[in-house]
């Protein structure tokens, strides 16, 4: 611009140079010694722009240096142009330094905000870690409770199976012993009847020659046979009556056999059911407490969100960057809160599922208790049936024993009469 305008004469006067060094402004100490690459590019471009001007000035001075009249004026003109360019360059550098200072201040504020944001995020992550740890501990507790309930259920099943097998084994042993005793009694009675028949046949064969003496004995034997047939008919009638009585006893007699064992088992099952119901009530109470916690956290988060929104309202309309960052921070805070609420809801649903599963186990145990009660009633009825059958067999054996004693008494009388008849014949 100096080459196109007129230059006043005072511009060519000699100016004294300052002897004291210039002091740097106080804001220069805040500028870092190492400039960013962008600033170095700006200085290099400025130095490149100055180089062609200095080269042109040297060419003009060398071209016009031969003229003696223009030499002094051209030197002063070139010096003034160089000074004006240096002043303009210094002003540009000062503007650039002020701009760099403003950028440094903005970067410091940004780094401070980022530091505060990182601290808040670290606190949020720590709170989330504590919540996750608490949720894991609660899940482990529920898994332990379910494992305990499963162990109790398996123990109940094993105990019921062992008791049922023991009852069946005892019933089978008792039935086999009763059958064996009945067979032994029948074989002994058959053997005794065979012996009696043999003794009667031998007596008839030996006394066949004495018809008169043995006629009475034959009549008595015939009478004995008739009595035996009548006894057999009476025995069959008694067996029929015993069968009817057994059926009547199986229908009318109340269950009293092994009642104490089944009552203790029933009491144990009722205690187990009561304990599971108490566990269910405890889990229900825990679910209600978790619901209260969720509501409290929701209320607290709403209050904190309102307070945060009130604090981050922009006081100056010339700060859109700060407002945008605050809005982004508020948005992230809402996302974290939503994730925490989703996690709490998932824990609540899982807890509810565990409670429903425990309810199903309690219902299954109650149904099994009822089924075992019905099986117990059936076994009691069958035991009563077997007891009545044993009693009938005992009565049958007693009747047969009485008949046998009567037959032996008749035989003894017949032998006595035979002996008396022999003595009379000898006389």
Curated annotation (Swiss-Prot):
Skewed-composition ranges (Basic and acidic residues): 204-214
Coiled coil: 78-298, 341-392
Alphabetized UniProt keyword annotations: Coiled coil, Cytoplasm, Developmental protein, Differentiation, Nucleus
Any GO CC annotation of this UniProt entry: nucleus
Top-level taxon: Eukaryota
Pfam families for the chain: HCR
Originating gene: CCHCR1
Described function: May be a regulator of keratinocyte proliferation or differentiation.
Location of this chain's protein in the cell: Cytoplasm; Nucleus
Keyword Cytoplasm listed: yes
Protein name as catalogued: Coiled-coil alpha-helical rod protein 1
Chief location category: cytoplasm
GO BP terms: cell differentiation; protein export from nucleus
Region (Disordered): 1-23, 189-214
């Amino acid at each position: 611009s100096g080459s196109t305008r007129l230059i006043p004469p005072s511009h060519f006067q000699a100016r004294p140079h300052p002897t004291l060094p210039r002091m740097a402004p106080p804001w220069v100490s805040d500028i870092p010694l190492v400039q960013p690459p962008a600033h170095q590019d700006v200085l290099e471009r400025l130095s490149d722009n100055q180089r062609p001007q200095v080269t042109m000035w040297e060419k003009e001075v060398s071209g016009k240096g031969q003229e003696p009249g223009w030499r002094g004026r051209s030197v002063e003109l070139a010096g003034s142009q160089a000074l004006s360019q240096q002043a303009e360059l210094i002003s540009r550098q000062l503007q650039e330094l002020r701009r760099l200072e403003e950028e440094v201040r903005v970067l410091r504020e940004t780094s401070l905000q980022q530091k505060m944001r990182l601290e808040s995020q670290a606190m949020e992550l720590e709170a989330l870690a504590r919540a996750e740890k608490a949720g894991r501990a609660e899940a482990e507790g529920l898994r332990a409770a379910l494992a305990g309930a499963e162990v109790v259920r398996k123990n109940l099943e094993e105990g019921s199976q062992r008791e049922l097998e023991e009852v069946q084994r005892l019933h089978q042993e008792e039935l086999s012993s009763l059958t064996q005793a009945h067979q032994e009694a029948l074989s002994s009675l058959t053997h005794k009847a065979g012996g009696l028949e043999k003794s009667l046949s031998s007596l008839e064969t030996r006394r066949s020659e004495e018809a008169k003496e043995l006629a009475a004995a034959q009549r008595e034997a015939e009478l004995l046979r008739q009595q035996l047939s009548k006894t057999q008919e009476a025995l069959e009638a008694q067996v029929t009556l015993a069968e009817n009585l057994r059926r009547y006893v199986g229908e009318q007699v109340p269950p009293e056999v092994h009642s104490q064992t089944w009552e203790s088992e029933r009491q144990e099952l009722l205690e187990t059911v009561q304990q599971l119901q108490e566990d269910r009530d405890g889990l229900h109470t825990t679910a209600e407490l978790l619901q209260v916690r969720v509501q409290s956290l929701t209320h607290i988060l709403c209050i904190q969100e309102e307070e945060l929104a009130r604090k981050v309202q922009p006081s100056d309309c010339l700060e859109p960057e700060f407002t945008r960052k605050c809005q982004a921070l508020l948005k992230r805070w809402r996302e974290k809160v939503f994730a925490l609420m989703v996690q709490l809801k998932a824990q609540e649903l899982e807890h509810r599922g565990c409670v429903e599963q425990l309810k199903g186990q309690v219902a299954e145990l109650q149904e099994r208790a009822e089924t075992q009660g019905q099986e117990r009633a059936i076994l009691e009825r069958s035991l009563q049936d077997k007891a009545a059958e044993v009693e009938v067999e005992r009565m049958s054996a007693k009747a047969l024993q009485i008949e046998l004693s009567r037959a032996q008494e008749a035989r003894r009388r017949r032998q006595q009469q035979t002996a008396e008849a022999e003595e009379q014949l000898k006389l």
